[in-house]
């Protein structure tokens, strides 16, 4: 990590917020980021010439030859038992699934469906019809093969590598399951801070030990709540 920082990064990365890599990319300061299509879409609108030079690839392979990346955003919909509108909420979720073609299109392919077998509703859907598209998977593949939001003169197949994202995407916490403890480790930046400390000169062994200590405290807290299994 220290070598990567010294060879390819600048001090500002230590103060990055969630959108900082987006801004660095469209400012022409970053050559590689790990992000969804949102950074690219921002570039198309704000700095078209930069966006035209942005491309997508699967995750880089690690030293063991595997390559994984975490899902960027996963929407979760929960209907509380105490809700006064349970039936209405269920109808809304069903309607959302049935009409996710529009969610895909109007999010400019930022959103992808969870249920690929869902049939595409008939009639005017508010976007140019896609010949032969019978279900959400057909639409998804057609749009990622030929991006309907590509700029004039821009390659339309840039998103094609993302069609196989399910093969190399996994949950935060892989190879274990996602759980509240993993969520807190992720949300409080335990691992990024470990990397940052090592990049700034802290002995790698010390950085790892500090991160391990914090992680154990977090897991123990959630074990006491009965929401994480295992032992210390």
Where do the language-model regions lie?
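A general structural signal marking secondary-structure boundaries and capping sites
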Residues: 5-8, 100, 198, 202, ...
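Non-transmembrane alpha-helical segments in soluble domains
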Residues: 1-6, 22, 26-27, 34, ...
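Conserved N-terminal structural module of periplasmic/extracytoplasmic solute-binding proteins
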Residues: 14, 179, 190-193, 201-232
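Extracellular structured ligand-interaction cores
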Residues: 27-30, 53, 74-76
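C-terminal lobe and pocket-closing loops
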Residues: 38-50, 63-72, 78-187, 227-232
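A short, solvent-exposed beta-edge/loop patch
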Residues: 184, 188, 196-199
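Flexible, solvent-exposed loop/hinge segments that line or gate ligand/substrate-binding clefts
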Residues: 53-63
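Extracytoplasmic ligand-binding clamshell segments of periplasmic binding protein
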Residues: 1-46, 57-59, 87, 207
